[in-house]
Every structure is written in structure tokens, then in C-alpha cells.
Amino acid sequence: MMEGHILFFFLVVMVQFVTGVLANGLIVVVHAIDLIMWKKMAPLDLLLFCLATSRIILQLCILFAQLCLFSLVRHTLFEDNITFVFIINELSLWFATWLGVFYCAKIATIPHPLFLWLKMRISRLVPWLILGSVLYVIITTFIHSRETSAILKPIFISLFPKNATQVGTGHATLLSVLVLGLTLPLFIFTVAVLLLIYSLWNYSRQMRTMVGTREYSGHAHISAMLSILSFLILYLSHYMVAVLISTQVLYLGSRTFVFCLLVIGMYPSIHSIVLILGNPKLKRNAKMFIVHCKCCHCTRAWVTSRSPRLSDLPVPPTHPSANKTSCSEACIMPS
């Protein structure tokens, strides 16, 4: 029997899962339709498509892991595929990193030769960055596939108090390498986001000086900086939780562990919602989807209200000649 706070957090986790799948599913469907219609995909759309696809798979894996931890599914099923979950998680982080780099290169204005070179070529580099990330994660994971599984399984099993165990000292170095593999995209993403925030703040300050404080409000730049800052906070939170779980100091049922579950599910869902709100095309399609759902609900409610009740249906005649009545005549509704 689940405790009260665990049951509450489990319901919140399910809400996060549904929200994240809907948000990422919208991104995938919109860009897939564009690909079918136009036979091509812009670099930004390709990044968003890959990121949303990886996050849908990641959220399915997270939900399956949570079901295992809540003893709703056998945890041995998750242990056998934990290497695949690690690959999807790292791929999702790399795609989010390149998305931050793309925004930084396209929006920021930094007078440096290297940055100007990146600004001119980032669109052509996007497919190669995606392909390189996939190859890098797959190759590095499968080179150490046996050791990776030997480390990740005890970390997952240690969440159960009865099966608590520790990673052996022989695997401590490889565990550091795995954590370092998550640190590299974090470092690149942090640098890109900080450069972008600095560029937006510098541009806002220059505009305020040229136009004047009263005439320049800067709401667009402030909202952009807050949006980018939220990306960084969510990314850092996801990384810190991954490192905290790898230290094996948590166990199932603790409030800290349940909070970590919320943080893990929060990143791929809330980040995708912020991406939709900041992208005009995705935001427009999201509004159309909501309006369509409301129209379908209103139409269904109207049809239900107009449907005749059982008491309003015509009572079949009891005369023997009623058997000769056709089926079409018997089903006629009163006007």
C-alpha cells in the first residue's frame, strides 16, 4: 500500500508524463507534416524534431522506471534495458545542448571571429552535429556496454532498501567517466546560454541608452532572457538529479527520492512547453489543437443534449399487426 505523499507524487508524475507527451507529440507531428508537405526540414525544425522524439522515448522510459520503483512492474525488466535508457537520456541532453548553441549563434551578437564563423555556418552544421552526437553516444556506450550495465544496474537496485548495494571500487573510475560524459553537454549548454543572456542584456542596455528609459520597455528582451534562464535552470536540475541518483544515497519511499522523480519528469515536459510558447508556428498549432478539442467537446455535448431520452422513444404497438411494421418506420424519432 502506497503512503499518502507517495501516491500524491505519483499522480503528479502521471500528469507530467501526459503533459510532456502531448507537448513533444505536438512538436513531432507539426514538423513531420511540414516534412511530408515540403520534402525538407529547416535546421531549427530538425533540432526540435529530434529533441522531441528523444524526449517522448525518454518519458516512456521514465514512466516505466517509476512503475518499477512503485512495484507496479517487475524491476528486472528495466534493469535489462537500462543501457538503452542511458543512451536516450544522453542523446536528449546533447540535442538540447545544440539547440541552445543554435539559439546563441542566431540571436547573440558577439564581435569575435570564432563566433562570427559559427554564426555563418551553424545552419549547415546542424545535421552533422546531430549525427555526430548519435554516433558519439552509441559508440562510447557500447564500447563500455558491459561495464556500463554493471554500474547502472546496482545504482537502480540500490533504490530498493532490501537490495541496497554499492558500486565496486573497480568501477569507480568508469562511473566518473559516465558522469563526465553528461558534464560535457552541460558545459557547452551553459556557455551558450550565458553568452546569449549577456548579448541580450547588452543589447537591451544599448537600446535603453539610445531611445531612452521611458520610451523603451524591453518586455520582449526580458521575456526572452527569462525563457533562456529557465532552460538553464531545468538543465542544471536534471543534471544534478542524475548525479545525485548515481551516488546511491537515495532509496525508494524517501521524500528526497520522490522529489527527484518530479525533477526528472519536469525537465522534458516543461522545457518543451516553453519551446512551444516561444515558437510562433508551434504556438499557433497548439492554439488550433486546443480550439479543435473544445469544438469536438462542444459538439459532443450538443449531440448528447439533443439525443432523445429512453422515456421519449415511441412505445411499440401491442396490436398483432405491429409485426408488419418495417424497421425503418419503427426507428423514426419524433420531431
Swiss-Prot record:
Give an example GO molecular function. Answer: bitter taste receptor activity
Q: Which domain of life is it from?
A: Eukaryota
Say what the protein does.
Gustducin-coupled receptor implicated in the perception of bitter compounds in the oral cavity and the gastrointestinal tract. Signals through PLCB2 and the calcium-regulated cation channel TRPM5.
Q: Which UniProt keywords apply?
A: G-protein coupled receptor, Glycoprotein, Membrane, Receptor, Sensory transduction, Taste, Transducer, Transmembrane, Transmembrane helix
Q: How does it sit in the membrane?
A: Multi-pass membrane protein
Q: Name one Pfam family in it.
A: TAS2R
Q: Where is the protein situated, by its record's location annotation?
A: Membrane
Protein's recorded name: Taste receptor type 2 member 119
Q: Which GO terms describe its cellular component?
A: membrane
What more is known? Answer: Several bitter taste receptors are expressed in a single taste receptor cell.
Single GO BP term: detection of chemical stimulus involved in sensory perception of bitter taste
Region listing for Disordered, in residue ranges? 308-327
Q: What does the sequence similarity comment in the record state about its family?
A: Belongs to the G-protein coupled receptor T2R family.
Q: Which residues lie on this side of the membrane: Extracellular?
A: 1-7, 65-81, 146-176, 246-256
Which ranges sit in the Cytoplasmic compartment? 29-43, 103-124, 198-224, 278-335
Q: CDD domains from the xrefs?
A: 7tm_TAS2R1 (cd15016)
List all membrane-crossing ranges: 8-28, 44-64, 82-102, 125-145, 177-197, 225-245, 257-277
Q: In which tissues is it expressed?
A: Expressed in subsets of taste receptor cells of the tongue and palate epithelium and exclusively in gustducin-positive cells. Expressed in the duodenum, antrum and fundus (part of the stomach).
Key word Protein biosynthesis present in the record?
A: no
Spell out where the chain is glycosylated.
N81, N163
